[in-house]
Amino acid sequence: MGKVYLVGAGPGAPDLLTLRAARILAAADIVLHDALVHPDTLKLAAHARFIDVGKRYGKVSTEQRFIHRALIEAARTHDVVVRLKGGDPMIFGRAQEELDALREAGIETEVVPGVTAALAAASTLQVSLTRRGIARTVTFLTPRVGRGETVSGTDHNSMPDVLCPPWLPAALSADTVVLYMAAGAGREIAQALIDGGKPSSTPVALVESATLPEEQRRITTLGELARATLARAEGPVVVCVGEVFRDALDELQLDSNPDAAPNELHRQVHR
């Protein structure tokens, strides 16, 4: 019987992988990886077999129960099994479900942490999520609820993926909020926060594909975001809200094109 390692691949850039993660990948016999793991990260597992078990919002995704079965089967036939997850396995990675399934099957497990998207976004923006006198609390959350998931007593079995109101109180009570899996939902998130009592002047930063060459950043306010027309995001997006981004809002010009329509957020590409 082999051992399964739940390994965090970090936010995207391969050189943000931890040394332990790189060592385990090099020894891997089989790697079950997320869709967003960088190809150069996979190259570290030079002798491994690969299985793509990725999940992407709005696209065909691997069912969780299949992932559980595949991990158990892999552990029965291989010594070193790696479940490679984007970011950190323990942040919105369904790691607990996989750990529980593996433990129930009597399989040894280990978790190797990775850099989560919220911290990658803060680093690329060069804005601390906490700041003396401004932000003492930080909340990570996702507004999305998957099919069949129950949140606060509400069964969403009939809805494939929704913006679920129970996230709002947590977002309103924190000084800084980072919303994961927010692609395509920026306007709705901004309007919900405003309706909940957040000032429309509150700074908000959107970071897509943090740490990668195609990374894109947008700095604006909740009010502007609620009215904006956003281009379709190709990569993962986090939405960061709070007064800690005030200086970034003052320093960065949202739109470099003076002839652009005022209600349109234009992409800023940083390489």
Can you annotate each of these PLM segments?
Residues D88-A174, Q216-I219:
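Class I SAM-dependent methyltransferase SAM-binding "motif I" and its flanking Rossmann-like core
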Residues R49-K55, E108-E110, L129-R136, G197-L206:
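Short hydrophobic/aromatic-enriched beta-strand-loop microsegments
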Residues H38-P39, A118, G186, R246:
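Alpha-helix N-cap/helix-start and coil->helix boundary motif
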Residues G2-V4, R76-V81, V145-R271:
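A contiguous loop/helix-start segment that scaffolds small-molecule binding in enzyme catalytic cores
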Residues M1-V115, A226, R232, V237:
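Class I S-adenosyl-L-methionine
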